[in-house]
Amino acid sequence: MAARTVYTVLEESARKYGKAPALHQPTGKGSYQTYSWREYQRAAREIACGLRRIGIRKGDTVALHSETRAEFYLADLGALANGSIAAALYTSYPAADQVANLRASRAKAVFIEDPKSMQALIAAGGPSLAQLQWILLTGEAEGALTLDRLRTEGRRALDQDARAFEKIHAEVRAEDPAVLYLTSGATGEPKMGLVTHAALTANIEMGPHVLNLTPSDSTIAFLPSAHIAQRVVIELVPIRMGLPVWFSESLAKLPHEMKAIRPTFLLAPPRVWERVFASITAEIKKRGAISRKMFYGAVGLGAEVAKLREEGRPVPKAKLGLLKVADRLVFSKIRARLGGRIRIAASGAAPLGKDLARFYAAIGMPLIEGYGLTEGGVVCFNPLDHPKSGSIGVKLPGVELRLAEDGELLIKSPTLFSGYFGDPEATAAVLRDGWLYTGDIAEFDADRYVYITGRKKELIVSSNGKKIYPARIELLFKTEPIINQVVLIGDRLPYVTALVTVNAAAITDSTEAEVKKAVARVNRRLAPFEQIRKFRILEREFSIERGELTPTMKVRRNRVLENHRELVSELYMGKEESQ
């Protein structure tokens, strides 16, 4: 029996769904190029054969450096079908980091988006990079193959031997390495995690257990393809379920695309959901008193009903009647901004604030939160019929979870990675006796739903010995319209302070006073030793370019503190304040 690999999942779907649409790539001219499932499979076969023709063998690393687009998917599946190790690189990193990651992957070939990107990488990395096999997904350049030319080479191989592809793919085993994931570096130095075909297919097979999606549904891909959430949930699981994927042309065009495509499934990081919320509340703030009262009254009613349903309690008929009115007058218009057809709205890649989750539940579009990581795959998800706000859900089939004595979440699962590429010491630190030590501090409720309360490495211990988890407190600011980001400070210090960035759309003459009120509101929900005593508003937002954010917009706490060390010092001069 042939090994079950990522390619065999595509092969099964091509047989099942045939000419049905699989991928929709924008042409830049207001139209889309559509690939059917059979065309998707054919492209993967041709690319695999083409890679062999240019000397790329089983076990060789092939890097992918591109924004998320259909050609990335084709190249990825072709590389995997060839038995190559596919290493996706973040395009948003500084050039020097991109070059370092490319070299660390030991790639022999690079699929790259366009000539400009290729020239920039070679310029940053020097002549040695020019010796790699460069394959352009779009455009043409001297010293590089185009994707079309590679596919032509593959077709020639198939013309010469009709079973050329079958011979190539027969070499691939389920236990063979399939992908290298670059960790985000949010909690340490970036590393590359090696994941096998068996681990990926195990994760793919979990999809139908939690997502009731069919070929009549659709989704939009816009997250970085180097991120595990995008790779598993929006690239690989759709293959198993026959789900068509539409690709966003750019983040700037995403709001328009949402209304035009009207997806039924959307995965986005909390930052996207926060921005939608902030834009709605900023707009409401500018309206008259009656409109504001209607909006906040409707949200309050929706939140009350959502809470009753979450707790399994009956909802009075009178409230259900009012909710229908609120939905028609208020909530349906908010959902229309996102196309109006979303059945499953998922949040991933970073923790979601409980208050933000309650807002979306109130408007009839509950955010389903899950949990995954480079080293473990996607292992938890909220049941669609009974999600719990603030929880990452329950374990997926085949996954075991337990807590260490200090509350660290441990995972045993067929989806676990094999280890960090070329770093056995780092691997041994996180994989012990078949269990993955995640570094996340967690709790279980009575129904075995999981709640992440913080990162082990981010724990703040004050000079008085009090333990504070900053992530839990920072999440409380997510529904404050004036606040963009908050980073807490206080490790080995006498009290807690914060660096704050504000929402540009909400800035007024009274911004500092508004921030002070927001801090006071959050402080009322905290123990005295957790309360923020001083804060400083930064003149700019955190950025990927300055190393303060990961590509999925998670804050790199240590880099933020390093970049603003003078301000941090000022926060601990003079007398302690209260907010």
Region locations from a protein language model:
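Conserved AMP-binding/adenylate-forming core of the ANL superfamily
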Residues: A2, K19, L23-Y73, L77, ...
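Conserved pre-ATP/AMP-binding loop-to-beta segment of ANL
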Residues: G18-P21, T152-L182, E189, N212-S218
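ANL superfamily adenylate-forming
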Residues: K29, K116-A174, I280-K333
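Conserved AMP-binding A3 loop
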Residues: T34-R38, A178-I204
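AMP-binding/adenylate-forming catalytic core of the ANL superfamily
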Residues: Y93, V110-I112, L403-E405, S413, ...
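Conserved AMP-binding/adenylation subdomain of ANL enzymes
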Residues: T201-S218, S225-F331, R341
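Conserved AMP-binding/adenylate-forming
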Residues: L266, A306, A326-V450, K456-L459, ...
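Conserved C-terminal "lid"/linker of ANL adenylate-forming enzymes
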Residues: Q485-L488, P494, R521-Q579
